[in-house]
Amino acid sequence: MKFKLKSKYQPAGDQPKAIEGLVFGLEQGMRKQTLLGVTGSGKTFTMANVIERVQMPTLVIAHNKTLAAQLCNEFREFFPENAVEYFVSYYDYYQPEAYMPGSDTYIEKEAQVNEEIDRLRHACTQALLSRRDVIIVASVSAIYGLGSPKEYEKIVLHLRRGEELDRRAMLEQLVAMQFERTNSELKRGSFRLRGQVFEIMPVNEDVIYRLEIGTQITRIELVDRITRIVKREQEDVWLFPAKHYVVSDAARERAFMRIKSELTEQLAMFERQGKVLEYERLKRRVAYDLEMIKNIGYCNGIENYSRHFEGRGVGEPPFTLLDYFGHSAGVIASEAKQSPRLSTTENKGIATVASGDLAMTNGFLTIIDESHVTVPQIRGMYNGDRARKDTLVEHGFRLPSARDNRPLRYEEFEERVGQTVYVSATPTEYELKESQQIVEQVVRPTGLVDPEVVVRPISKKHENMKTLKQLTQVEDLIIRIEERVKQGERVLVTTLTKKMAEDLTEYLKEKKIKATYIHSDILTLERIEIITDLRLGKSDVLVGVNLLREGLDMPEVSLVAILDADKEGFLRSETALIQTIGRAARNVNGQVVLYADEMTGSMERAIKETERRRKVQLAYNQAHGITPKTIEKTIRNILEEFGVSSKKQESKESKKQNRSGVLELDMLGDARPLPEIIKDKEMQMREAAKGLEFELAAILRDEIRELRARVATSLKPKSKKKK
């Protein structure tokens, strides 16, 4: 299928010129170009038009998860018939393994995986291996290890109605694909077999595939996971591995041999150096890890052995999302039924994709959004990771091969990406120097001019105050917020620290202002919901530190307040100020207030550049008779677009309600008295704690409390009715 752009708007302002310029550059084979577009000029719409014109699979890289989610949602609006997917880190919490020699402190890796985001990541790789019309919007996670696309592709499973099926071979294949067999409730990446019926829940969808089999597949049904209602019957189904790291038995045995060989060499080196502690530490660690992998297929930190499992040489970069782009041919879903690309495994009734059949050149487009931030971020990932790994290797916590479980170096990243377009309102010297063409997009189709910039001393008599009281920046801010709220508009406030953002938010709430904060400690999905709530009017003020600078598109915002603007530094540099000022450029009433007692060089340059852009836009408006108007943008629930449950961290009350609901289901058909059920659950809780299953023990503890509350309620004497 081809990319098909859908929009009620046509390119206007500087957009037509920018589109033609970028398309010309791509057709001429230019490796790097820069789109220098001011905030609110429709850079995303321009790039959507470019994608439709060149018809290339596209990788869009953003510098944070929130911006990536917003971009993904916008591209989904533009390309509703094509595959637009979201690829970011699936960790809600991540503490990397580390060792601090100074204090002799070892920190074990801790991580909390978000299953919803993991599902979206699988949707990305599966789209890349099944079609050509794919746009992936990713964070810097795109340069981290993901597993070999060749190994992943080898065991893709294609099941067709009417084909002969060896049930044992299919069971073995599903297990090899990292699917878990279960006899109870299905979850993503699991399957069960009941009589003649296979039920399989893929990792990238919230549905169940039900297969009825005898000597052949007689029926394939798509079933709703909750209601178990059959949505439709299908002629065939494609199943992809449940995990990105897929290793065959033969590859595992080879990896074990290589790990043991490397261990022997490293132990010999420690012995020569007289490092007895490091010798014993490494020997025990690797022996334990290998035993765990052998018995359960996994160990904590297994990714540190990825070089051996993937068969890579010393220093070779890991496989990443970029390799899936380079490997993609987009033929599975659309062409496979008529194509000779499939080979059937003899006597097993399983159609698998023949190795190498999907290989193609890396003919894809790369768009680096907010490149002035994203490029340095990509460049810095490798060095930080390497320093930490060197310490672990030196002190016997890891083998030297752990260094190759790493992000790509910047030069490796550049080797793997396709033709690149840097997109920024403030590109750095690097982008301008590297680009073969600079395309400007300064004029906004809406006629909107850059916002008015007001510099206000941190203490000053406010024009609306009748008394001589000197106002602080926060008191002045509250007056301005109240004015905007009366007009139904929103406000962004940037502070210097997370603590300041949290404290200011609490203070605003005390003043009956609907405010919330956002910073790096807020979980990915919650950040997205906070921004959606601001646009919907559930909150009026959003306070942040660094996440409010680049790219966030909120036309409802008419006031941006920058506190302590004269504190020169990273967060108050010329580029940072221009980007933050741009957050008010999508509203006709846009205004920016810089709270400062001194005029810094960064402030002066940012204000001067903003004024220059205002003059360019005003001249264009006058020449074309354009009246500025606020950008109109549909408010869509991004989480629902991704098929993710829209919820913040559950309140105690909602958790209690959920617990009660689970208990009701758990007790269906259990006619025992409540005290007996409580006693049984207490025993289960102790067993869980004894087995170190603390999460299960905590759930049982909460259930016991709920049941005891019911018992207490039932024992209360009923009040007598008054006559």
Language model: regions and residue ranges:
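Conserved helicase motor "Helicase C" RecA-like lobe of SF1/SF2 P-loop NTPases
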Residues: K150-K154, T495-H519, E706, R710
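Walker A/P-loop
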Residues: Q28-V50
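Conserved strand-helix element at the start of the C-terminal RecA-like helicase core
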Residues: P57-A69, Y86, K275-E278, R484-E506
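Conserved pre-motif I regulatory segment
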Residues: M1-L36
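N-terminal cationic and glycine-rich segments that engage phosphates or anionic surfaces
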Residues: T34, F87-I136, V140-S328, N362-K486, ...
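A cross-taxon signal for low-complexity, glycine/charged-rich
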Residues: A336-I350, A354-M360, E653, Q657
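Conserved helicase ATPase core of P-loop NTP-dependent helicases/translocases
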Residues: I522-G544
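Conserved RecA-like helicase motor-core motifs
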Residues: P80-S89, G301, V454, E489-L492, ...
